[in-house]
Amino acid sequence: MKKIHLICNSHLDPVWMWDWEEGLGESISTFHQAELFCREFDFVFNHNESVLYEFIEEHDPDLFERIKEQVKAGKWHIMGGWYLQPDCNMPSGEAFVRQIGLGRKYFAEKFDARPATAVNFDSFGHSVGLVQILKKCGYDSYICCRPNPEMMDLPRDFWWVGKDGSRVKVTRTTDENLYCTAFGNAKNEIIRMASSYADGEVGVALWGVGNHGGLPSRKDLEEVTALIASSDDPLVHSTPEQYFAELEPKTEFTKSMQPCLIGCYTAMQSIKQKHIELENKLFTTEKLCAYAALNGLYTKNEDAFRKAEKALAALEFHDIYSGTCASDGEKSSLRKADYALELLQTEFNKAFFALCGKHQKAEIGEFPVFIFNSQPYAREAVCETEFLVPTPIISDTEQYTVSVYQNGKKIPSQCIKELSNINYDRRKRIAYRCELPALGEARVDIRLETEPKKFLAPTTGDEIVFSDSIKTIRISRKTGLMESCIVNGKEMLSGGAFRPVMYEDNADPWGWNMEHIGENPVDFVLCDGSTGPFEKLTNVNVIEDGDILTEVESFFWQGSSFVRISYKMYKDMPYTDIKADVFWNEQQKALKLKMPAAFDGQFIGQIPFGSDTFEKDGKEITAHRFVGFRDGENVLTLYNNCTYGFSAEGNDLYATLLRGAAYCAHPIGDRILIDPDRFIPAIEQGKHSFAFRLSYDPLEKLENNAQEFVNTPFSLNFFPHGNGNAAENVLSVENPAISLSAFYQEENGYVLRLVNNNAEPNETDLTLCGQSHRLSFGKYEVKTCFYDGSSLIEKEYWV
């Protein structure tokens, strides 16, 4: 005899082929009918996603109160407990915690509910980094439907083991209809699902009309009620928690549930890049406000941060973040994110000026600049700042030059091209190398002088050679590519690095039935200056050269598209920044950057709260802010703030930048994918920018180095009116292998989240408000601590 748990649900995408308003409106209709059926039939309705309940609470409060009564009666089960069902590959570990926290807090407050089973039926794959997050957010089990069985061979039920050793029970359902049943056909589909289980097994059947809400029909409920009464095997209306309480998996799985719909790792880069920008703005602003608050200078606007968290969580919805929604969903989601960024910038500004205003007034002729370091350790950094000179120089023979001082000592600096283009010398942009304190603001002072106007010498010869105490880089003027990068005597590249390559692709943003992105590669070639955005420009040219950096730009074209690659090589710093400005005019084509390495190293990349290894077989993988090839305890690393799709084949590393897919073009059997007799807009048309950093770094420092790259220190010319009583340092972390994921103020104290980016146990000294604490970590362990003003307490559950 087998027992089948019937979990009735109504999967409802707030956004997909439709926009938020339609999805949320459908939630009212679905929840109304569900509440009526709960009163009429003896069954349990399961639903998750607090964003939908919030919408009901606001727009139909009477229905909301009736739902609360059904929850109390056990007829309506709060399932999952997250804000919504996000993409489960691309959010950072910290973003996952916020996604879960929003739902957890809402359901606890409104329904006194704390689900133990997390549910992401429709997400397109699941990172192994989730396991520790699930466990430490109070979950013991997880149910999902993807990757589909034809995409990945998995046991139906297993123990999922995380990088730190955390374990949760998982069911990956294998039914062809995933999480729902066809309208009026639930009985037959439940019989089919039950038949896949053997005698003695505990099984699950997900049923109910879904994808656009809908519920089971009255006919479905009547027939399922009769089926339960007549079945020889127990069929019970149930919840995920009741199902997992009776399930004991017999196997373990220690990897990510990937690949799955690999086109989603790159499609709709506008959303992906906006998410990266927003999550880092949120976490950086929280740190700044916590620093200011502990100095008694500012208390954050909690409402602004909560709205920003919700905008971030909304952007993560699996049909938005993955780039598979219609164009209206892209537009409205970007609008939500920009609103959140504006809220956060207001908070950032208030805290920043409160801190900087305490500093000593400037001397006559000085231009003070303040730089905020969000990292919890002191470091040297190259920063860039613009400021305005009171009096312009309008001359072809004379110009301003600057000297920069920190603590009375002159530091290296260089004037570079400002962002504006008014043809006189008044707006100045400078690059300088300075010392930054742990989680705090540094001050430098600029002084002006005049000098005869200088011009860069024309670029000549077949190659451009940059050399300093750490590295030697060669850029060919015949190819425009980085042909060599020697670091401390060791060659990193095998030639031709950062070449743009175009591939044949298709209109499907999901990438159904694909393992690789693109076929039949065609290299971009140097522009001849005859047409396009780089018309009449030298195709490989030095555009900046001074005491801080040398910058070279190269111009390429292929098909109807153009790419500018810039190499910004910093003197006596271990890294080089590469930027790709893309003018993309292709449909059903893909764009990648190619980086051939000079050695055979293990392919690694960042995942939520950790890193993972990948095969070098050319198949598309998803990684976060770094990928690279491991070389012993060092890694040839490519950091980024712009994409999630990568692959490696042999010793060649590829970053996938763009696909020319159509909006929401989902394959339906063997039917044609898109209408051939009209213009169909492609998602990625127009100008895009992608930023990378190339460096050869110790493995344990990759996480912090990635944060340094993505969170460029904010700097501003500002004249303070204080008396020199600057804010005191409040936080520092000694071990470079330990990173600070979050530091924020909440009611009655402060939350700190720290990550051990190491496969071995680790320790660090942490100094907080003058008190020293010794913290011990297991492998890849993440700790959440609470500071109440006097003691630091580790939290068992994060939310």
Where are these regions (language model features)?
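N-terminal catalytic cores of secreted or lumenal carbohydrate-active enzymes
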Residues: 1-94, 98-99, 107-109, 136-139, ...
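Alpha-helical scaffold elements lining the catalytic groove of polysaccharide deacetylases
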Residues: 88-109, 174-196, 525, 550
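CE4/NodB-like, metal-dependent polysaccharide N-deacetylase domain
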Residues: 96-129, 133-136, 190-206
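Alpha-helical scaffolding within the catalytic cores
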Residues: 29-33, 58-73, 99-102, 146-164, ...
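C-terminal (or distal) subdomains of carbohydrate-active enzymes
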Residues: 130-133, 154-156, 183, 190-191, ...
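Catalytic grooves of carbohydrate-active enzymes
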Residues: 11-17, 22, 167-357, 370-376, ...
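The substrate-binding groove and active-site-proximal loops of carbohydrate-active enzymes
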Residues: 10-26, 48-57, 81-97, 113-125, ...
